């Protein structure tokens, strides 16, 4: 599989929204309070305007994953891989890209029910910070953090 990670283009936001929605709704426990797929493109536009750095993973000419970071706040905000492209190293490559973009460290949150996601993040060196409530929806989330270790990079 030939894959690259690059900045997303505005004409790709609909495709990105579809992958985001499909992946989020299929993760363990689903995605509480996720926007309707028809409005996710608008949410992407607003988020990019507010400071998202939005990257896509492209394999064999097709977008198969997304990574949204907020560099100013050291946050990995969204990381999703299309269900049919999972377990092929794409998520790990996107997470490595986040580690490059946010080299001093970052935090993220994921639903408490997303057990597969928890295992993925822990396998890739992230540590649990705390279980808490999502600041907007109130849904239970687990916060993870990553800091570059002296032996990395």
Enumerate the predicted regions with their spans.
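Conserved N-terminal entry element of GNAT/NAT acetyltransferase domains
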Residues: 1-11, 146, 150-153
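Acetyl-CoA-dependent GNAT
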Residues: 7-84, 95-97, 101, 134
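Short hydrophobic/aromatic beta-strand or adjacent loop that forms the aromatic wall/cage
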Residues: 52, 139-145
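Active-site acidic-Proline motif in GNAT/NAT acetyltransferases
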Residues: 82-84, 88, 112-113
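Short glycine/proline-centered loop/turn elements that form peptide/ligand docking sites
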Residues: 91, 95, 114-117, 134-140
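Conserved acetyl-CoA-binding loop of GNAT-fold acetyltransferases
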Residues: 122-130
């Amino acid at each position: 599989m030939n894959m690259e990670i690059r900045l997303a283009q505005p004409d790709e936001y609909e495709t990105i929204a579809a992958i985001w929605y499909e992946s989020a709704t299929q993760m363990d426990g689903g995605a509480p309070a996720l926007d309707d797929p028809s409005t996710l493109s608008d949410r992407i536009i607003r988020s990019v305007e507010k400071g998202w750095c939005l990257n896509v993973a492209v394999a064999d000419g097709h977008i198969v994953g997304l990574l949204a970071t907020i560099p100013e706040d050291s946050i990995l905000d969204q990381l999703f891989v299309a269900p049919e492209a999972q377990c092929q190293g794409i998520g790990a490559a996107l997470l490595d890209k986040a580690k490059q973009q946010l080299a001093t460290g970052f935090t993220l949150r994921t639903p408490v029910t997303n057990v597969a996601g928890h295992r993925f993040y822990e396998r890739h060196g992230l540590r649990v910070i705390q279980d808490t409530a999502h600041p907007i929806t109130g849904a239970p989330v687990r916060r993870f953090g990553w800091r570059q270790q002296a032996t990395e990079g």
